[in-house]
Amino acid sequence: MQVSNSMSLNDEEDDIEFINYIPLLASPINSSTCSTSIHDKCPFKQHISENGQNFGSAISSNISQRNFKTLRASHLSQYRDCNRENNTEDKNVISTGIAVNEKYQSVLKLKEKAPQISSAAKRKSFIKERGMLAKCFLARLEDEVFQGRLTSSLEKKEIGIVWSKSFSTTAGRANLKRNNKDAPLGKKTYAYIELSDKVIVTKERLYNTLAHEVCHLACWIIDNEMQNPHGACFKAWGKRIMNNMPYIEITSKHNYDIDFKYKWLCINEKCNKLYGRHSKSINPQKQVCRLCKSQIKQICPKIKQPNAFQIFLKENSKRLRKLHPHITHKELMKKLSDEYHRTKDAKQNVSKSVSLISSSDL
């Protein structure tokens, strides 16, 4: 199946069309899911160099083919998520002297003036719109790459999206279900993609993971290839998607930096193994580093040290409870508080008297 390229860049006016054509998609980091080595990237990433000449020759003559790759990256960078706080790369692209139109420069100025948004606000905004973003992206893949063949044999004529909280490190998983496993694909076939609520936290990860999982579904539904999950069939579909959408990158397995809520570090400087969990499931008092058997310490979130009053409560609550077994918890806390303040005042008076004696001796 050949993918037709609907872009036509023949003159200077089409340069503006090229900028407008780039959708509001973030540039990829590295994508995908499943069970292969992290560094096992697909060899078809050369699609940029293969098709660079077709794009470069169509753009205005004042932009050389050598600079096309940089121009493409600069255009895409302007449409990244607003959570990119550092736009020095975009400024460097402008300073290289590449010919860019006024519309592009206005986009850069608006980006520089945009207010800074907190990470919590970004996450909340992404959660609100991620369902619609995923649905629109899958519809575009079905229309431009698969030409309607992917969902035509499904009962609901669409691919479902399920957000999972149980995926702690896996970005996504494609699923194809039939009521009768021996029956061919038909009306009783359901397809859906599970996405990690903890890993998929940006648009770029969403689009790259969806593209990866859709390649699996295409192998199963269109080519009936069920054996090799990341074989020639998977790579062929991945190449077609990336040729049609250069801002998408499909690899065998993702290497996203997952933002774990809890982190522990091995105290052995030669090891320094970092452990991350979404819940407080590691107890440094009972568990050690699995590599060097050294102790580990919690580094995130930082453990707050107890203040003087908390230490006093821990040391004296049992004693006062034995002295007053029938009082309520509120009354017990009142007695502890009064005793703490008396002890604190006594210590301060002693320190003042000591300082006065020392000053008189001088």
Swiss-Prot record:
Keyword terms of this UniProt record: Cytoplasm, Cytoskeleton, DNA-binding, Nucleus
Give any Gene Ontology cellular component: cytoplasm
* Organism superkingdom: Eukaryota
The entry's DNA-binding region: 306-348
Which Gene Ontology terms describe the biological processes this protein takes part in? protein-DNA covalent cross-linking repair
**InterPro entries referenced in this protein's UniProt entry, alphabetically:** HMG_box_dom, HMG_box_dom_sf, SprT-like_domain
Task: Specify the protein name.
Answer: HMG box-containing protein C19G7.04
Species source reads Schizosaccharomyces pombe (strain 972 / ATCC 24843)
